[in-house]
């Protein structure tokens, strides 16, 4: 099965699943706060608290969904059924969350809290099995990179489709009635997302089977935490999300106050996203040429250097800024597919260590720490902007505020990239030679713990 070559159709099908997720996720990230405050008419403070509590709920729902998926048995596999049968309620709740029923003030607060919580839970129901699916479609390292490259090309395209189409749909469907427009716009996008998820279900196949296990959920959680390589990838995930979240949160401020025009935001973001598309496509050929771990840490090191260099770009060098953000977009998205393959490798490593393949809970944990990184990045933006004396009503900002905006856009991501490079080089040991040895032993039914895995260190010969 390691020699199985995935068809382009299956790679596109798998990528369609993440395109569907990003159609909804990117839309919620960009428009939902505005919808709640300006269309539905509820206080921004309540909305912020609601978003924060949803992240707290993820601490419970994400691992529970991963554990549940790992224990699913069906003729369609462990993960694919959740994608198909979760898609319809997910789409319906999206429409409900963007609806504006005529309720009292308290009724609106309750309605928003209930529908947003349901939206968060159903996103978890669909997305965690989807992410885990990438680890069981194939165990071929080369094919995994190719699969994840297709995934992130299509995910980026899905996010761009959603953010570009939403407001034209709102205006076309609702006209002056923005409440109707938002409801209709998300309904159209939800139908598109459902069709993509259905296509993902029907064109993919689970091939990597987990050995039988009768352990408890508590034991599974213990075993996944004992997987040192999973912990390393978890830290790398937080750093990756922090970098993109802090930079993304500062982008509007950067284009408005540093580049001098809020109108440049769309072009700047589009340039970055086009770079993302190219970066995703480059992951496969580069990792064919060089060990993916080396590509990962070298790329992060280069991102750190470029981000620091961008700090010193003059404020009037508009073209230079566009060149920088394009190259950074390419390099950042180049490492993202590699990082997801590294997560799949940690699942194989866990099976090799203790005979248990914990795909669902492994990916659930990674998604949860990515949400922690997302929340931390948003908090960093708010905290530092506040300390700099930012005044949205002012015609100009003071020098301290401008320096903080530039630092958030450049230096904070640079620190994240540098830490990622150092941690990956120093602590991530699942490099190509060792992986080949490990996968060969798994194929033969051998496990490290059959020789006492708790005491024996990994052979240094295979770490390099």
Describe each PLM feature range.
Residues 2-464:
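Membrane-embedded alpha-helical bundles of multi-pass transporters/translocases
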């Amino acid at each position: 099965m390691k020699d199985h070559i995935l068809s382009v159709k299956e790679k596109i099908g798998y990528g369609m699943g993440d395109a569907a997720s990003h159609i909804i996720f990117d839309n919620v990230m960009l428009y939902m706060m505005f919808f709640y405050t300006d269309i539905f008419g509820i206080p921004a403070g309540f909305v912020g608290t609601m978003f924060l509590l949803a992240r707290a709920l993820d601490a419970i729902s994400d691992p529970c969904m991963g554990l549940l998926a790992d224990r699913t048995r069906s003729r369609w596999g462990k993960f694919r059924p959740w994608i198909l049968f979760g898609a319809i309620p997910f789409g319906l709740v999206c429409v409900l969350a963007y609806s504006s029923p005529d309720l009292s003030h308290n009724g609106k607060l309750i309605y928003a809290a209930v529908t947003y919580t349901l939206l968060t839970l159903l996103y978890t129901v669909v997305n965690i099995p989807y992410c885990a699916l990438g680890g069981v479609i194939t165990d071929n390292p080369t094919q995994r990179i190719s699969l994840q490259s297709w995934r992130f090309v299509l995910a980026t395209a899905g996010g761009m489709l959603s953010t570009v189409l939403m407001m034209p749909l709102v205006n076309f469907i609702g006209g002056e009635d923005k409440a109707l427009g938002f409801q209709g716009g998300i309904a159209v996008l939800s139908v598109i997302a459902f069709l993509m998820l259905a296509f993902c279900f029907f064109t993919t196949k689970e091939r990597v089977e987990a050995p039988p296990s009768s352990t408890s959920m508590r034991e599974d959680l213990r075993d996944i935490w004992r997987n040192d390589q999973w912990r390393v990838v978890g830290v790398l995930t937080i750093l990756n999300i922090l970098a993109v979240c802090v930079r993304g949160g500062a982008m509007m401020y950067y284009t408005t106050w540093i580049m001098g025009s809020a109108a440049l935001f769309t072009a700047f973001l589009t340039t970055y996203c086009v770079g993302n598309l190219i970066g995703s496509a480059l992951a496969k050929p580069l990792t064919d040429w060089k060990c993916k771990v080396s590509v990962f840490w070298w790329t992060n090191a280069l991102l750190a250097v470029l981000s620091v260099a961008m700090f010193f770009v003059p404020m009037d060098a508009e073209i230079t800024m566009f060149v920088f953000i394009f190259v950074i977009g390419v390099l950042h998205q180049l490492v993202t597919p590699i990082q997801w393959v590294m997560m799949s490798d940690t699942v194989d490593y866990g099976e090799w260590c203790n005979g248990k393949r914990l795909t669902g809970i492994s990916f659930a944990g990674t998604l949860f720490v990515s949400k922690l990184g997302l929340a931390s990045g948003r908090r960093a933006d708010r905290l530092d902007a506040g300390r700099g004396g930012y005044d949205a009503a002012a015609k100009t900002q003071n020098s301290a505020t401008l320096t903080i905006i530039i630092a958030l856009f450049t230096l904070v991501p640079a620190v994240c990239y540098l830490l990622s490079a150092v941690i990956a080089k120093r602590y991530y040991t699942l490099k190509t030679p060792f992986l080949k040895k490990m996968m060969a032993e798994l194929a033969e039914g051998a496990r490290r713990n059959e020789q006492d895995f708790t005491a024996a260190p990994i052979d240094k010969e295979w770490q390099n």
